[in-house]
């Protein structure tokens, strides 16, 4: 989320840190023995955690901080278990861009200065447009994900040189599976380029933009929803008019941050016969990144074809 939303990512209280300090060296020793053969990795979300597992396979021990598909990541509350995992991590993968600032703060408070930290937004090279805000949901941008995979491979190889070749091979295989996803986006662009769509949040915008689609949602609407603020009546009516007036072909709906105003958008779209494509910010249970993104792109293509 934009930097301002990091205020809603609750940090550890001093009491929690005191509790962590009392965890004891015996627990640390037991954990070290159980994972000594694996590289300890912490990912801010299960999206990045799954990518790490795809590359590290059985040579990594991955902790994903945010993994509940029913939870709004914007309001996540970090805890002492997260702090403990980050204090021991050799490799850390975060999204960056204000989405998960708690990771850097917890690394600092846990005095872990040696971890290799991969910041996906920095890897992407993306910046905020002039007069606008950065869309930090870079895991919906497949070229960025490919670069992140390379960084993960390199970090794991540094931590475990004996398995470097396997990490590189796995990263290459993972990136090869991204190519069909980009081809699907190119096909959508060829068949539906210029089509207007609506969103509830900027989450899917890298996917829709790569597919040649035009977002018609008032910026004030999606920004307010992303910030957890109320949408003004005027902006809400402008958004709803997109559906009643048949001005968009699809609504892409973030299920993880739904509320009364986004539900009104969903209801208006359905009432107008406009397809709704649900998306999430974290992996649904039982899915992996590649399967999840394949389903997202396929759902978008199917909706546009109706």
Feature annotation, model-predicted:
Residues 2-14, 19-306:
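Extracytoplasmic metal-acquisition and chelation regions
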